[in-house]
Design a protein with these regions (language model features):
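Aromatic- and glycine-enriched beta-alpha-beta binding-site module
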Residues: 57-137
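Intrinsically disordered, low-complexity regions enriched in small/polar residues
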Residues: 14, 19, 23, 58-59, ...
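N-terminal domain-onset segments
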Residues: 1-66, 193, 201-205, 215, ...
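Interaction-surface and assembly-scaffold signal
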Residues: 1-7, 101-230
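Generic preference for flexible, low-structure residues
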Residues: 42, 51, 61, 68, ...
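Generic structural motif
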Residues: 30-33, 57-59, 76-80, 129, ...
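A broad, low-specificity signal for short, low-complexity segments enriched in glycine/proline
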Residues: 13-14, 30-37, 45, 84-85, ...
């Protein structure tokens, strides 16, 4: 650990984080009107295609396994195109704090999770306040479809002053997740449901057209990232 950060102060480990992962994702086109305002400057929206996913990480760093779920937009900054988490949910306090403070993820806690399948059918969901915000059911067909380039991840890491309404820290973070192995990569068709919620308006980005779905397993490292002052 950097000795500028006293030992035992942070409630999470510093990068690199490492895990085996499982991801169930559906890709779709959404209305641009509700999507555009959710992409903060200086990031720029590249298309109206989003990824909506439920993920499970059998993690070695941190040591506790966890779930994530997200709506990820296709954005660009400084000639770099990647994925920005419009909405994000996770299952542990440690990941909630660590991903926000290190890389700038936008996270809330999810209350109820599932992700599984049998090689032909897969399903996954996240619920919060008794509402299934994302519920995906996929049937494996092998049908190919066009996917946007959503790696690297692009985040706006913003922390406000405690004394007034201005940013104490504001940077674009380019995080190049290192996928070292992909052991399962299945494509198919999906059904997606998104429960309306005033507190969690994920359903405002329900796709008007589904493009396809995939289920992936592999191994990944979340490294230190590049920070750009804005």
């Amino acid at each position: 650990m950097d000795k500028l950060i006293p030992d035992n102060v942070l409630p999470y480990p510093l990068p690199p984080w490492e895990h085996d992962y499982r991801v169930l994702a559906v890709f779709g086109e959404v209305e641009e009107a509700p999507l555009q305002p959710l992409v903060p400057p200086p990031l720029k929206l590249c298309s109206s295609t989003v990824q909506i996913s439920v993920m499970y990480f059998d993690s070695s760093v941190p040591t506790e396994p966890y779930y994530d779920a997200a709506v990820i937009a296709d954005v660009e900054y400084g000639g770099i195109r990647g994925g920005f988490w419009i909405h994000g949910y996770t299952s542990t306090d440690l990941v909630h704090a660590g991903t926000r403070e290190i890389w700038g993820y936008r996270m809330k806690r999810g209350d109820d999770w599932s992700l599984g399948g049998d090689g032909e059918h897969y399903s996954g969901h996240v619920a919060r306040r008794n509402k299934r915000l994302i519920d995906i059911k996929m049937t494996v067909t092998g049908k190919e479809f066009k996917q946007p380039k959503l790696f690297p991840r692009l985040f706006l890491k913003l922390i406000p002053h405690a004394s007034h309404a201005q940013a104490a820290l504001k940077k674009v973070v380019v995080m190049r997740a290192e996928t070292t192995a992909v052991t399962v990569d299945l494509k198919g068709e999906a059904r997606l449901s998104m429960a309306p919620s005033l507190q969690d308006p994920v359903a405002d980005l329900a796709p008007v057209k589904l493009l396809g779905a995939n289920y992936i397993e592999g191994h990944q490292v979340l490294p230190w990232a590049e920070e750009v002052d804005v």
